Amino acid sequence: MEPAPDAQEARTVREALGRYEAALEGAVRALHEDMRGLQRGVERRVAEAMRLAGPLARTVADLQRDNQRLQAQLERLTRQVEALGLASGMSPVPGTPGTPSPPPAPGVPDRAPRLGSARFASHATFSLSGRGQSLDHDEASESEMRKTSNSCIMENGHQPGAGPGDGPPEIAQNFSAPDPPRPRPVSLSLRLPHQPVTAITRVSDRFSGETSAAALSPMSAATLGGLNPSPSEVITPWTPSPSEKNSSFTWSVPSSGYGAVTASKHSNSPPLVTPPQSPVSPQPPAITQVHRQGERRRELVRSQTLPRTSEAQARKALFEKWEQETAAGKGKGEARARLKRSQSFGVASASSIKQILLEWCRSKTLGYQHVDLQNFSSSWSDGMAFCALVHSFFPDAFDYNSLSPTQRQKNFELAFTMAENLANCERLIEVEDMMVMGRKPDPMCVFTYVQSLYNHLRRFE
């Protein structure tokens, strides 16, 4: 008897389901194996990461403990310092938290603005009447300025006062207290416009005591300063004794002019020695004053021409006149005193002044195209250096990048006009003169105008 078709079909279905179930179980087992393998890999990597992070965690914990220990020690030291300060009666240290800074004493003047203004004045011009032409003169002597309140500062023709600190060390030691201030005659540098250094004249550096005394009289000093001597400044003549003729004197001419002459004697004699007066000229005062004014006017006109060499020639002629006048009335056997240049005029060499001014121009034109300052002649021939110097102080006045070295006349006209309008710097050089001089203009003309630019542009720094 054969089975029914329904029973056979049901058995076939059950066999198919069994095979399908076995396949599913195999797939699930394979999936479980893969999951266990992945879990083992993750656990292995986590363990490796934990092993690597373990020393770092221990190091961080050690650092935290050290930080806490140091903070505790710092607090303990702070309390000890405060206890010591209270025990010794000292006030708390200014600047600590909770401690206000003490206000400045009302009786102590603030010297910072004056020092700053004096330092600015020292950088303003290169003046022959100054004590030095170095740009760093005031920075080097700032400590001396704070210690000596009556030191004589002569920068750019400005002289705030006079004191014993301005003379040599031998004279300064004999002053126990500063003299009361009294009005001083205005020096020639204040009465006349600024005249830049153009040349340095070598002169004899040895003068005898009597020679200098006869030449540098109060009347001649006042004449050089452009003023008549006041009755309060009349000084009694001094006649050296035979024992003093062989003594060594050091004459110092202050920077305010050729007026006041002092001397220091290397012995126990009085510190200040006044040379005798020269005989007063019988010329009437009115005629003398008119003659002096005419000479000053001619000197002013001569100083405004280019190149400026009148000052050096005038100084050389002055010394030659002194030597001629004193050689006629004095013997050759008298002792001669050494005139120290550092104490007489304080004039640096012309090359050093030019180098300082050239370095200043380089610092202001650094980074500008077509500008390579090597001298005061060819480096300024195309006008680009003048434009760069003015543009460094007034960057909004014109577009420097639009200029070209080939347009020389345009560059000169632009630089000179902007300097005159913005910095009030007069034209000491004309555009036509620069065009005529070509690629190698006169160094003295260029130096004179650049120095004038320096004097006016420094005010805008």
Swiss-Prot record:
Which keywords, in A-to-Z order, does the entry hold? Coiled coil, Phosphoprotein
Ranges of Pro residues composition bias in the record: 94-107, 272-285
Question: What gene is this protein translated from?
Answer: SMTNL2
Q: Would I find Phosphoprotein among this entry's keywords? A: yes
Q: Which PROSITE patterns match?
A: CH (PS50021)
Residue positions of the PTM Phosphoserine? S101, S129, S134, S256, S269, S278, S344
Entry-linked CDD domains: CH_SMTNL2
Extract the InterPro entries matched here.
Answer: CH_dom, CH_dom_sf, F-actin_Monoox_Mical
Segments for region (Disordered): 87-193, 227-248, 260-307
Q: Where is the Calponin-homology (CH) domain?
A: 351-458
Query: Which Pfam families does this entry report, sorted A to Z?
Result: CH (PF00307)
Coiled coil location: 55-88
Q: Where is the composition biased (Basic and acidic residues)?
A: 134-147, 292-301
Record bears the keyword RNA-binding: no
The record's comment on protein family reads:
Belongs to the smoothelin family.
Name assigned to this protein: Smoothelin-like protein 2
In the record, which positions carry Phosphothreonine? Answer: T96, T274
